[in-house]
Amino acid sequence: MRRLLLLLAILIAAYVGYPYLTLYWLDQALLNDDQEALERLVDFPQVRADLKAEMQGQVLEKAAEIKEKRPILGTFGQALTKLVAPGLVDSSVDGMVTPEAILSNPTVVEHREKNESFVDFITYAFFTAPARFIFDLKDPEKPDSPTVTAIMTLDGFRWRVVGVEVPPLEQLLSKVP
């Protein structure tokens, strides 16, 4: 009976610790410029699809708000947004959410050159369901920077990043100089 309880305790500890180990592997992939490891740990097609849907929804929602404030100009703007926004969002996300783009990001390159871990960027990390784990990221050097939430799910026997939740457009755009 003791062995069974010990085995159960070890399995639970391994299960609870595994997503944190995955965060460590992500950190190491970024620091070592390891594209293959990053591709194993992040489901890039899924992340891009989710991010495109989220960003397109935010852009169209903003266009609808403008239409309510300025009916004539807003109607034209909303129609134009519906026509142009999907292509702009898709091409932007496709260009920015790739292993190559992430590994060549200036912040990532700077940390890699200094051999500094990205652990400081994580402000929260915990389970939201038995097979779902989230972690919040924020630039520690910029206290007013927006928080981005990454979502990991248990895919077979490994944890993978499958989504990213970004703050509302107003918050993102207010930080642009």
Predicted regions and their residues:
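Hydrophobic membrane-insertion alpha-helices, especially the h-region
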Residues: 2-20
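Alpha-helical transmembrane signal-anchor/signal-peptide segments
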Residues: 22-37
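Short beta-strand edge/turn micro-motifs at domain boundaries
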Residues: 110, 120-125, 132-177
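Short extracytoplasmic
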Residues: 35-65
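Short C-terminal domain-edge/linker segments immediately following a structured domain
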Residues: 60-61, 69-72, 164-170
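Surface-exposed, charged secondary-structure patches
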Residues: 63-142
